[in-house]
């Protein structure tokens, strides 16, 4: 099954592909467009496409949301709208040493940040008052004393994760 780059499926199922398309400046990527003078999201990845009538095409337009969703892992829970319950599924690419993202919810600021050195990732998340979160430990990582998910009440939480595979 195919998905649009930056879409929910690509972010969740192929985070490394989404990351590469976001940071590279070779074909195909957002950086490719910028490197070649584009200031908007084109209809096609190819710059010489015969039919490219849209110079502001939403199909590839999830780059902004991708940062807080894809790397920060900040998602609402569909069963508790408005970020009363937050689903956290951060992604830690080995080639990136730090990241920080925030989202202003109706309950307050949600912040997800991390630093990475070698196999160690220090993850910090801030959950606003009257909210709670479920952190899904990413595949290939371990958290001492936890498996699968960690339930987090409102407040600031610092979690040390260790990469168990490259």
Question: Whereabouts are the PLM-identified features?
Answer:
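Single conserved hydrophobic/aromatic residue that forms the stacking wall/gate
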Residues: 1-6, 11
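Non-catalytic C-terminal accessory modules of carbohydrate-active enzymes
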Residues: 16-166
């Amino acid at each position: 099954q195919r998905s649009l780059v930056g879409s929910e499926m690509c972010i969740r199922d192929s985070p490394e592909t989404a990351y590469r398309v976001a940071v590279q400046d070779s074909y195909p990527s957002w950086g490719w467009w910028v490197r070649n003078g584009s200031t908007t999201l084109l209809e096609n990845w190819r710059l010489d496409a015969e039919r490219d009538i849209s110079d502001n095409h939403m199909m590839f337009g999830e780059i902004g949301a991708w940062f807080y969703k894809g790397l920060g892992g900040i998602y609402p829970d569909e069963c508790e709208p408005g970020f009363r319950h937050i689903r956290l599924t951060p992604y830690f690419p080995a080639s990136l040493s730090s990241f920080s993202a925030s989202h202003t919810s109706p309950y307050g600021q949600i912040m997800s940040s991390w630093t990475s050195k070698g196999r160690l990732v220090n993850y910090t998340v801030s959950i606003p008052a009257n909210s709670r979160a479920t952190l899904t430990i990413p595949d290939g990582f371990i958290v001492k004393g936890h498996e699968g998910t960690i339930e987090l009440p409102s407040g600031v939480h610092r979690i040390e994760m260790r990469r168990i595979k490259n």
